[in-house]
A protein has these predicted regions:
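Class I S-adenosyl-L-methionine
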Residues: 1-136
Length: 136
């Protein structure tokens, strides 16, 4: 990644008792990963690429991976730096109770539009946790 100012790696969190887990995902301009399992393979259809609306935006796939590995449906998530809302989209998809804060009105409004566009496309197929429990 010598040609850009972006880091090759970002450490999200660690402690003294657990090992570091690496999430590999291509995220450089128009070169974006295909999926969680194939994050190192460039997505062929550029129309499926995420549009960046925030300078430190992370891919939704990163939060999908985090939530799949470290949460259960119905868990509560607090994001104090909401930014582009990628975590909110992934939390919605994972059935999490999500609260987010963003200090910038501009970025808050951008992520709100992004979230509304996402949910308007998926609401027909999305069940929230209480609806899932009703069907059990």
């Amino acid at each position: 990644n010598q040609a850009t100012s972006f880091s090759d790696c970002e450490l999200a969190a660690t402690d003294l008792f657990t090992t570091v887990r690496l999430f590999r995902y291509m995220w450089s301009g128009m070169m974006q990963g295909k999926s969680i399992k194939e994050g190192h393979i460039m997505q062929g259809n550029k129309k499926l690429n995420e549009v960046r609306i925030h300078p430190t935006q992370k891919p939704v796939a990163l939060y999908d991976w985090i939530f799949q590995n470290y949460t259960s449906p119905g868990d509560r998530v607090l994001d104090t730096h909401l930014g582009s809302g990628s975590s909110r989209i992934a939390g919605y998809s994972a059935g999490l109770e999500f609260t987010g804060f963003e200090i910038s009105a501009e970025y808050y409004n951008r992520q709100e539009r992004r979230f509304q566009e996402y949910t308007s496309q998926t609401d027909m197929f999305h069940l929230n946790l209480s609806e899932v429990k009703q069907h059990e």
